Every structure is written in structure tokens, then in C-alpha cells.
A protein has these predicted regions:
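Bacterial Sec-dependent N-terminal signal peptides
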Residues: 1-25
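Sec-dependent signal peptide cleavage junction
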Residues: 18-48, 160, 164-170
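Sec/Tat-exported extracytoplasmic proteins
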Residues: 45-50, 116-119
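A short, surface-exposed beta-strand/turn
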Residues: 80-94, 148-163
Length: 170
């Protein structure tokens, strides 16, 4: 009986471990592997912020420089939840800020309440893109056990997923 229980437990554990969703295109890296252009730009744009981690993202699975993005996760005045994404040359692609549901602007919250009546707003990320300049709220919604992300501009208009910048789709 004990052997059967152990075997059953190991099968369950193995299936849980092997079924985890892993993004092989993003990995943690030490600051020493971040290009100096990226480090300098981060220091210039966010001089008082503490970078807690660096990640590198390989676009399309390619590891050559034009296909890499460097992502800094940092704190602003002790508040975590900020990130910035850079090209290897130091060009800022976008930065984002975590927002609890309570501080999402009223025009966005009201539209979500109207469009997604059965959902609860969990939080949002306020994302600023720089080429071309766009500001987007990526809002996480919950319904029972389901999760859905919706996207709104600063005027409170929903953005169709097919018109989002490529960087947000990856």
C-alpha cells in the first residue's frame, strides 16, 4: 500500500513539474552581461532607482544582437513593479509601471466595468512605448478561475489585440 501511494504521488508530482509553462526566450542575467550602453541609459533615465534584476529576451529565438532586448526590473522610491526594455544599443523601447486596481484612472475603470460586467479588475500595467509614442493600460481581469488581459488607451478606449505593438504581444 505504501509503495502504491508513493508511486501515485510521484506520478502526480512529475506531471505537475513537466507541465509548467516556461518561456525559453527570457532568462535572468547578471548586470555584468548587460551592455554598457543599456546600463548608461538606465542610469540616465532612472537615476534614483534600484535595479533588482536584469533579464534578456531573445526575439524569435535568435541570439544575435539585433534580436535581443534587455529588461530591467526596478523600484521607484521603494515601490517595486517598474520595468524598462532596451535594445542592445541602449535605445529605450518601453517602460511599465504596476498599478493596483484602485489607482487605475476612472475613465478606464468605468469602461471596463461597462464592457466586462462579470469580471473583477485585479491590477494593470501602465506601459509607455516610445517609437511611436503610445501609452497603454494592460489590465488583468478575473472571472471565477479565468484570467483575461484587456488593453486600453489613456482616453479609456479599448485597443484591439491585433493593433497592439509587437513588443507587447511577445
Amino acid at each position: 500500500m505504501r509503495n502504491i501511494f508513493t508511486l501515485l504521488l510521484s506520478i502526480i508530482f512529475t506531471s505537475v513539474v513537466t507541465s509548467q509553462d516556461v518561456n525559453d526566450n527570457i532568462r535572468f542575467i547578471p548586470q555584468s552581461q548587460v551592455p554598457q550602453h543599456v546600463l548608461d541609459r538606465q542610469e540616465t533615465l532612472f537615476p534614483t532607482n534600484f535595479v533588482s534584476e536584469w533579464r534578456v529576451q531573445e526575439m524569435d529565438g535568435m541570439q544575435d544582437a539585433p534580436n535581443l532586448r534587455y529588461i530591467a526590473k526596478f523600484e521607484d522610491d521603494g515601490r517595486p513593479g517598474f520595468s524598462a526594455s532596451y535594445l542592445p544599443s541602449g535605445v529605450l523601447i518601453f517602460n511599465s509601471e504596476f498599478m493596483p486596481s484602485e489607482i487605475i484612472p476612472a475613465e478606464v475603470r468605468l469602461k471596463i466595468d461597462r464592457d466586462y460586467k462579470d469580471y473583477t479588475i485585479r491590477h494593470a500595467d501602465f506601459i509607455t512605448f516610445y517609437n511611436p509614442k503610445r501609452e497603454i493600460y494592460m489590465v488583468k481581469l478575473l472571472k471565477d478561475i479565468g484570467v483575461q488581459y484587456v488593453f486600453y488607451n489613456t482616453a479609456g478606449n479599448e485597443i484591439p489585440k491585433d493593433s497592439l505593438p509587437l513588443e507587447i504581444k511577445i
